[in-house]
């Protein structure tokens, strides 16, 4: 059993590593404007920094979760930190956008390897108040996601966009040194290549990644001229992926769940919609603030704090509401506030004073905070008890799919320039997403009533 001091050091080692994925997924939002202008890119092209990160995370997290079981969690955790360190050192000196994109992929894969390894290390070595220990990781992740844009804004003022990569180094060094010292040596030797290939659905992974990449390229091409062949290839690969997952014993994504668990499927659909909505704001607003409203990167970051700050404040309150009343009412309230916020954003945001803008963003933050916590609780409530690990992994995949879809929407809307008309169009899309979330919330309430 770990002493109180050793437990704190162990958790610090894990948390300072696992926070890197949410921190880097959100800090980039304030840097897109600077990177776009430095490399002379369209928004469509620079948006690949968003979509590629989430696509790599969607593939890497479940894969590295299995790899940790096979080759050892300490080994994989430290290797993930090394990959993120490579990106932190290499990205600031990237001579081309393609080099920067590769560094961003290193960052995504490395930070994705750290999270499942960190959770596994806590489950194996912290047995007293384990739920509290895991809650620390959740709090760190939520705080980093929410505060990333604001922190990124101040870092960019200090050292330009390279600063958002360099800032990772102190956390990497801290996590690596503490982990090297605190984490027990892996019990098992590293598995062989043949064993790893047998345990991983390599074909499923390739079909999934290939299908998403081709569809992304097809959808983003709408800002210029549509690449129909890529769209057809993407659909064919995804159809082949579904067929493969239905046939194999160890699927990359267990698509059977969508057919057998209707309540859970409704949660997944709502979570995708929530993340499309949120990440359109998360990545779209900073670019609009800087390009069209000509606000400084620092001011843009402070504006984003209205939304992210309220989502942090409302999250623990939502947990208490769920404990008293269940998940149905908070899910509906979150969808209602999202829709109302989107309407206010579209109609009034451009013309109101600063306090009005802050209130609208705060309302949107409350809606997201309610939905995010309530849907996580609903996922756990509707999951079969023997499949929580699988359903939790799929839940994260839905987050990444929503994020990827938002980057496509923004790439199409803001492809050549960012204007008030494009902002209004984004607002209309968000109203549609909010309305769909409301309908799904009503549907979910009916399903839960039938189940009870």
UniProtKB/Swiss-Prot annotation:
Ranges annotated as spanning the membrane: 8-28, 39-59, 77-97, 100-122, 134-156, 161-183, 203-222, 226-243, 266-286, 302-322, 330-350, 359-379, 393-415, 425-447
PANTHER family reported for this sequence: MAJOR FACILITATOR SUPERFAMILY MULTIDRUG TRANSPORTER MFSC
Membrane topology (UniProt): Multi-pass membrane protein
Main localization category: membrane
Protein's UniProt name: Uncharacterized MFS-type transporter YwoD
A single Gene Ontology CC term: plasma membrane
Keyword list, A-Z: Cell membrane, Membrane, Transmembrane, Transmembrane helix, Transport
């Amino acid at each position: 059993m770990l002493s109180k001091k050793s437990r704190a050091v162990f958790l610090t080692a894990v948390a300072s590593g696992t926070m890197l994925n949410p921190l880097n997924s959100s800090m980039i939002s304030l840097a897109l404007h600077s990177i776009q202008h430095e490399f002379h890119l369209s928004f469509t092209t620079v948006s690949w920094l968003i979509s590629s990160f989430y696509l790599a995370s969607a593939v890497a997290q479940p894969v590295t979760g299995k790899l940790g079981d096979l080759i050892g969690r300490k080994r994989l955790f430290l290797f993930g930190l090394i990959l993120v360190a490579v990106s932190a050192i290499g990205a600031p000196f990237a001579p081309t956008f393609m080099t920067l994109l590769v560094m961003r992929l290193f960052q995504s894969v490395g930070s994705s390897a750290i999270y499942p390894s960190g959770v596994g290390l806590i489950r194996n070595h912290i047995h007293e108040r384990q739920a509290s220990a895991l809650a620390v990781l959740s709090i760190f992740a939520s705080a980093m996601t929410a505060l990333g844009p604001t922190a990124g804004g101040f870092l960019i003022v200090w050292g330009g966009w390279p600063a958002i990569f360099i800032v990772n180094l102190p956390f990497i060094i801290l996590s690596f040194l503490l982990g090297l010292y605190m984490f027990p040596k892996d019990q098992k030797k590293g598995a062989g290549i043949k064993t790893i290939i047998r345990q991983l659905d390599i074909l499923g992974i390739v079909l999934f990644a290939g299908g998403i990449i081709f569809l992304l390229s097809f959808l983003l091409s709408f800002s210029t001229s549509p690449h129909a062949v890529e769209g057809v290839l993407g659909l064919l690969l995804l159809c082949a992926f579904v067929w493969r997952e239905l046939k194999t014993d160890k699927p990359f994504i267990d698509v059977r769940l969508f057919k057998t668990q209707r309540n859970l499927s409704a949660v997944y659909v709502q979570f995708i919609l929530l993340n499309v909505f949120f990440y359109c704001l998360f990545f779209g607003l900073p670019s609009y603030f800087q390009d069209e409203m000509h606000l400084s990167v620092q001011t843009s970051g402070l504006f984003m704090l209205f939304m992210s700050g309220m989502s942090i404040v409302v999250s623990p309150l939502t947990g208490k509401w769920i404990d008293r009343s269940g998940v149905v009412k908070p899910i509906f309230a979150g969808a209602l506030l999202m829709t109302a916020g989107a309407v206010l954003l579209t109609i009034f945001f451009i013309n109101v004073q600063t306090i009005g803008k802050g209130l609208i963003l705060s309302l949107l933050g409350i809606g997201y905070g309610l939905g995010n916590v309530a849907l996580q609780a609903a996922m756990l409530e509707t999951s079969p008890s023997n499949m929580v690990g699988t359903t939790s992994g799929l839940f994260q995949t839905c987050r990444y799919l929503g994020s990827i879809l938002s980057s496509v929407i923004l790439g199409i809307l803001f492809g050549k320039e960012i204007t008030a008309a494009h902002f209004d169009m984004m607002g209309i899309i968000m109203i549609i997403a909010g309305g769909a979330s409301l309908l799904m919330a009503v549907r979910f309430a009916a399903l839960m009533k039938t189940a009870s």
